Each structure stands twice: as C-alpha cells, then as structure tokens.
Design a protein with these regions (language model features):
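Residue-level recognition of single "structural anchor" positions
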Residues: 1-303
C-alpha cells in the first residue's frame, strides 16, 4: 500500500464494498493481495474510530435491531478448540438501524450470548439522546440487555416470527417459511404500527450482497476474524456516508444530520495517514486517538 496512489486506493475500496472478494479485487485492480488486505485493515481502523466519534447524540424515534450470522474459517460444529481460540467458528454481526433515517447507529461483531447483547445495547444507548422505541427479534438475551442499557426509559417490543412445519425428510439450508409474527410488548408503550424489523432485515440483505464474506454457499467466508470485522467496519462507513439511499435520495448520515454532503470513496480514503510518511505509525496512533480510538483494532472494531 506504500506505493498506492489515491486513485488505486479508491479502486480497491470500491471493489470491496460492492461485493468483490479479496482475490477478485486483486484481479480487477492489479494491486497485490497483501496490499489489498493491508488497506482494508488500516482504513477499517480509522472508519470504525470515525463512526464511534461522529455517530453520537442522535435523535432517534424508532430503532430496529437484528443480528446476521456468518462464520470464520469453518462452522462452529466443525471447529477444533485450537481453531476456536483464534476466532474460528460462528460469528454474529449485530446492527441497530434508525427506521426513519436508515442510519446504522451501532454495530458489533461477536457472539450471540448475553454478554455481547449487553455490550451492543449499551453502545446503542450511549449514542441516543431521547426516549426511543426499539424492536428486536425474540432472542432472549435482548430482554436483559435492553433493560440493563435503557432502564425503564424506553418503549420496547419483541417481534417473534412463526415458522411453518418442516418435513423431516427434506434437507434445507434456509429456515422454514414464515407464516406469521407474534408481537410481545416488553416495556413502555410501543406503537404497534411501528413494531417491525423489516428495515434492519433489508439492511442485512444489503450486507449479504455487498460484503463478499457474507455470501452464502461459497468459499468466500473470512479466514481471519480481524479481516471479517474490518470488512464490516468498512461497509458501514460506506453505507452511512457514501451510499445514497434509494428512497431517501441522500445518504443516511445526511438524513440524520451528521453529514452535509455525500461522501466520496476518495474522501473516505483521506482518513488514512499520509502514505510514505516516516512517522506513519505515530500519525495513525494520533489520528485514532483524536477520533476516540487507539492504535488497536480490538478497541475500534470489537469482535
């Protein structure tokens, strides 16, 4: 990446956020594989730190939360204890979406247990300044996590999908057909008309189509948890600040008031410290500190 021009950086990032794998990006741009990965990791660091600093003090009326599954290295049932220790196995990306502005308020790459749910909801609560209506799926961990983060100052409902019977002799990859939904009011007085996870589930689909690592039934899955988390951080920066939403006609960041123009991918790349600088590592550490992170991927891209 030391010799990449700004134009080459833009080409690489554009390929990555539009559904191309690392190797496909190499073929499209002519940039070496290790250079592509290094650019992904370095840019993801500062993008995650920028999101953490800027996406705060939001006025949100309706928040939809969901999680999307993928795996690193292999599915959990096929992972040895040795590989599990380095991050292989099932991994969940939790997402909180503002139903009005379509802004991704918070995201977290990690497990699906209560500890991760609490961390996710606490992060959501720290970014919102008003009483909010939240809808999640029926995952039990959210019951305690939401109460722990928001207390009683919330209107919260769960939407539990009801699936049809599955033929025992039928092999399926996807869940059975959804035949209905059951709404459960957990706290406060949520408006039944707005108890929904449709927008955040549609955002999950955008992730599946735009991040190659999330594509089902391929060998494009992540081999390292660090690269997986970096791809998510890069995508959400692009989604919030660069990608014009079809129904809004502006970016989610503009609609929510935290940006005043559509970012270009080149503008994203300018977040990186200047290439070729003898003090690049120090520059990066100072930049991350200014943005609210530090020189550690674990701190700015939790996984």
């Amino acid at each position: 990446m030391n010799r990449l021009s700004k134009e080459q950086q833009v080409q690489v990032v554009a390929a990555l956020v539009e559904g191309n794998s690392i190797r496909a990006t190499v073929r499209l741009t002519g940039v070496a594989k290790n250079t592509v990965v290094k650019l992904l990791l370095d840019l993801a660091d500062v993008c995650a730190a920028y999101h953490d600093k800027i996406v705060r003090n939001l006025r949100v009326r309706r928040l939809q939360c969901d999680e999307i599954w993928q795996y690193v290295g292999a599915k959990a049932k096929n992972v040895s204890l040795e590989k599990k220790a380095i991050g292989w196995g099932d991994v969940w990306t939790r997402t909180a979406l503002d139903a009005d502005t379509k802004l991704c308020v918070s995201y977290l790459v990690g497990g699906r247990d209560l500890g991760w749910a609490k961390e996710f909801m606490e992060d959501c609560a720290s970014r919102i300044r008003n009483r909010v209506q939240i809808t999640t799926d029926g995952h039990k961990a959210y019951l305690e996590a939401v109460e722990n983060a928001f207390g009683a100052d919330i209107d919260y409902a769960q939407l539990q999908k009801i699936y049809g019977a599955v033929n025992e002799n039928e092999t399926r990859y996807s869940p059975a057909r959804c035949i209905g939904c059951d709404m459960k009011v957990v706290s406060g007085d949520p408006d039944p008309k707005h108890v929904s996870t449709s927008f955040v589930e549609r955002q999950n689909l955008s992730m599946r189509m735009s991040i190659r690592r999330f594509t089902r039934l391929t060998n494009a899955f992540s081999k390292k948890i660090e690269n997986h988390a970096a791809a998510v951080a890069l995508w959400f920066m692009y989604y919030n600040f660069c990608r014009v939403h079809q129904t809004l006609r502006v970016t989610p960041a503009m609609e929510s008031g935290i940006a005043d123009h559509v970012w270009s991918i080149e503008e994203m790349c300018t977040l990186l410290p200047m290439e070729g600088s003898a003090t690049k590592k120090a520059d990066k550490a100072l930049l991350l500190k200014a943005l609210g992170g530090d020189d550690s991927r674990q701190a700015v891209v939790p996984f």
